[in-house]
């Protein structure tokens, strides 16, 4: 069953107003948040894997792997690079053949060809597996995802986390089929609040509270 997500992508200008300074961080909180591995028509330049993580996290040393569901072998390895932007969303998109991609909001363009299910996509760094998504019917196959497999999305549809902040360790529970893929967007409730902005808003709230108390005393 397909479900809709209420989505938002924060412009960099908004984050800039908060005086945010991004610095490289660890990879532990980075997860696979959406994957379109079978586009309607040609896959060339149209498929993607979206990651969600802490803004400012450097992805050097992180890779995506395609795991064959028939024998568990690694058939594709994609070394990643770049830094997760201020909205926490990083889109790894397929190369259309000229160094560009047809995927919206692409942050990194690579030659990508993930197979249809049953297969798995694994996100890892030097320390081990960060996240994994298995999709399709693994009866008699090798499952490299988490918990129970997500369904095999039909052509043109993606698999997406209903909430990128929630990782129960079960692909079937965490992922849903989206009829309309949403690369570069996440549910509004999941947009991370930069620390500087959170501090600013907290301070403003305190000032307003003091002003109200003083106004009450003056009456």
Label the predicted regions:
Residues 168-190:
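A recurrent domain-boundary module in secreted/ectodomain proteins
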Residues 2-12:
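Bacterial N-terminal signal peptides that target proteins for export
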Residues 16, 26-27:
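Cleavable N-terminal signal peptides
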Residues 27-155, 162, 169-171:
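Activation on beta-sandwich/Ig-like modules and their edge loops
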Residues 208-219:
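C-terminal membrane-anchoring or membrane-association module
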């Amino acid at each position: 069953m397909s479900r809709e997500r209420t989505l938002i992508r924060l412009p960099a200008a908004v984050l800039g107003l908060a005086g945010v300074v991004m610095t490289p961080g660890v990879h532990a909180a980075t997860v696979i948040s959406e994957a379109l591995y079978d586009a309607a028509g040609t896959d060339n330049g149209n498929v993607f894997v979206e990651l969600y993580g802490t803004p400012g996290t450097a992805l050097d040393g992180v890779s995506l792997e395609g795991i064959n569901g028939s024998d568990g072998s690694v058939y594709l390895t994609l070394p990643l690079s770049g830094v997760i932007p201020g909205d926490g969303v990083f889109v790894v998109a397929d190369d259309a053949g000229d160094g560009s991609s047809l995927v919206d909001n692409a942050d990194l363009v690579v030659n990508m060809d993930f197979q249809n299910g049953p297969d798995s996509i694994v996100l890892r760094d030097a320390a081990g597996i960060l996240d994994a998504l298995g999709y399709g019917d693994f009866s008699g196959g090798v499952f490299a995802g988490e918990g129970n497999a997500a369904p095999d999305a039909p052509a043109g549809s993606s698999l997406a986390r209903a909430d990128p902040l929630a990782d129960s360790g079960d692909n079937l529970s965490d992922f849903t089929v989206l009829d309309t893929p949403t690369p570069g967007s996440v549910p509004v409730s999941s947009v991370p609040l930069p620390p500087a902005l959170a501090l600013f808003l907290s301070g403003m709230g305190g000032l307003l509270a003091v002003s109200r108390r003083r106004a009450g005393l003056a009456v």
